[in-house]
Amino acid sequence: MEIFDYDNILLLPRKCRVESRSECDASVELGGRSFRIPAVPANMKTVVDESICTWLAQNGYFYVMHRFDLDNVQFVREMQGKGCFASISLGVKKPDYDTVDRFVAEGLCPEYITIDIAHGHADSVKNMIGYLKEKLPRSFVIAGNVGTPEAVIDLENWGADATKVGIGPGKVCITKLKTGFGTGGWQLSALKWCARVATKPIIADGGIRSHGDIAKSVRFGATMVMIGSLFAGHEESPGQTVEENGQRFKEYYGSASDFNKGEYKHVEGKRILEPVKGLLANTLIEMEQDVQSSISYSGGKKLMDIRKVNYVILGGDNAGEHLLM
């Protein structure tokens, strides 16, 4: 098995078939809807809030609302009342089951539900998937997070409509340091490994440091890429604004950090300051254009044409050109 990550892989270009990158279609389908780009902001308190999710939905982007200090039922009611799709996160505790029961009682059904726990290959996730499929069968269920083919196979067999791959590769995640487990440092290999057995969409979660990493994720099997740090630190971001030496920053912390949990127990995340990047809309436009450029370099016109290219591994035991077989 080849071990590599985003920073030591490059994709090999093929003959360009377009006059301009604007001819390339960066859109992707997930759960019966088409979205402008294969990227989604991480469902974290310092990345998304109600207003950002509304804007994303109204402008053709996928979103997943976080599950912290939030009335999910009210959120779904308000989003659907605005004519937007509703995409929420749930855990696997009793309050999460109670939330599902409230949806049923009120005749509400979120279009997307992400079961969002740090170690998603678990009986607790199996049970929640089963409950959702029984009570809210029209919801598109994303389950995670996982990092092995066995986990992907199990989640799909349990009824998940998509799986989220990535354990601890994120910029503010310290799972690998705290536990010794995870996909940090080899997230792209883990994605490739998991995608080989997947029959349903994979969302690659974590480890993205640049827009080119989106194309690399698609090449190795991702349908959608969840990103935290690149989407944090915008003017609209919900994180607290901090000024140091005349420069403005936004706080950004992991979902399992003591800042998010409000207590120093079972901490697997940290807090950092992200320089304020400007407006989120501008970043999304740039991201879409960069993905379009990636498609043009792949010799194609559609997003999934990126999966046809060869690649090279830079340095290490696996270095060299790897042809698509």
From Swiss-Prot:
Residue stretches in coiled coil: none
Family: Belongs to the IMPDH/GMPR family. GuaC type 2 subfamily.
Protein's UniProt keywords contain Oxidoreductase: yes
Residues reported in the UniProt entry to bind NADP(+): 202-225
PROSITE patterns associated with the record: IMP_DH_GMP_RED (PS00487)
Active-site residues, as the UniProt record annotates them: 173
Record-level GO BP terms: purine nucleotide metabolic process
A cellular component annotation (GO) from this entry: cytosol
Top-level class of the enzyme under EC nomenclature: oxidoreductase
Pfam families on file: IMPDH
Molecular function GO labels: GMP reductase activity
Catalytic activity: IMP + NH4(+) + NADP(+) = GMP + NADPH + 2 H(+)
Species of provenance: Delftia acidovorans (strain DSM 14801 / SPH-1)
Function, as annotated: Catalyzes the irreversible NADPH-dependent deamination of GMP to IMP. It functions in the conversion of nucleobase, nucleoside and nucleotide derivatives of G to A nucleotides, and in maintaining the intracellular balance of A and G nucleotides.
Keyword Oxidoreductase: yes
EC number: 1.7.1.7
UniProtKB keywords: NADP, Oxidoreductase
Gene (UniProt): guaC
Protein name: GMP reductase
